[in-house]
């Protein structure tokens, strides 16, 4: 499910509509190229000079002087920033989880909500940022709570579209835990809609991905949506 809204919408809160939740069909970790998995490799150190040269060309392209004092170190700074913002390519799900899976016999919903995230839109390489809500219903096994936030972080630190990002997080949790169900909702503001193009400050996009009982059972979805709408009393 994907929901987009902007100022002037009739919704007073995120319009999460359980009946429209989508099922997930597993697919490759990254986007595909003509049906084949795209050739994407972890960045190499020698590429940093190529990135710096590219930034210099961009500076020239916008009519600036890359040799003036304020811009002398900009290519290096931008290259390093891009490496950080896409550091998720250097991580793998197996290394991230690091065997932090435990047999607890727990079979009720586990939810980590309001996980702040930042990512880069792959179309314009502009930021989008927001909050993720991640839940699963264990099949006896649980994972360390921080790992759910780290999974969100790993996939966010790549060139992304929000729809795929949401799906990848759900599929990752399904892969490591084989739970009875997984639910992920992400709410984000996209700078490519705010700073350029349609230029709509205040617009936001909601995406959801449902697996297993969250997709199959209305009551389970409704419980999840109610929990992420609920405002904790201790904050």
Curated annotation (Swiss-Prot):
InterPro entries documented for this protein: GTP-CH-I_C/QueF, GTP-CH-I_N, GTP_CycHdrlase_I, GTP_CycHdrlase_I_CS, GTP_CycHdrlase_I_dom
EC number from the UniProt entry: 3.5.4.16
Entry annotated with the keyword Iron: no
Pathway(s) per entry: Cofactor biosynthesis; 7,8-dihydroneopterin triphosphate biosynthesis; 7,8-dihydroneopterin triphosphate from GTP: step 1/1
Record's GO cellular component terms: cytoplasm
Disordered: annotated span: 1-42
Assembly with partners or alone: Homomer.
UniProt name for this protein: GTP cyclohydrolase 1
Protein's organism: Nostoc punctiforme (strain ATCC 29133 / PCC 73102)
């Amino acid at each position: 499910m994907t929901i987009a809204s902007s100022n002037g919408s009739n919704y007073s809160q995120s319009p999460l509509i359980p009946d429209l939740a989508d099922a997930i069909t597993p697919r490759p970790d990254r986007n595909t190229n003509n049906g084949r998995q795209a050739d994407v490799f972890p960045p190499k150190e020698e590429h940093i000079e190529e990135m710096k040269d590219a930034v210099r060309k961009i500076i020239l392209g916008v009519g600036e002087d890359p040799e003036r004092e304020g811009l002398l170190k900009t290519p290096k700074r931008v290259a390093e920033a891009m490496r950080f913002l896409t550091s998720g390519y250097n991580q793998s799900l197996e290394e991230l989880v690091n065997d932090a899976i435990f047999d607890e016999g727990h079979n009720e919903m586990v939810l980590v909500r309001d996980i702040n995230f930042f990512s880069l839109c792959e179309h314009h390489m502009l930021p989008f940022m927001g909050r993720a809500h991640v839940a699963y219903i264990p099949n006896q096994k649980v994972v360390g709570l921080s790992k759910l936030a780290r999974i969100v972080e790993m996939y966010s630190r790549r060139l992304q579209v929000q729809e795929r990002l949401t799906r990848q997080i759900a599929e990752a949790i399904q892969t490591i835990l084989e739970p009875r169900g997984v639910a992920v909702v992400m709410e984000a503001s996209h700078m490519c809609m705010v700073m350029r193009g349609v230029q709509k400050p205040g617009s936001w996009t909601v995406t959801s991905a449902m697996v297993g009982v969250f997709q199959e059972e209305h009551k389970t979805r409704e419980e999840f949506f109610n929990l992420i709408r609920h405002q904790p009393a201790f904050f």
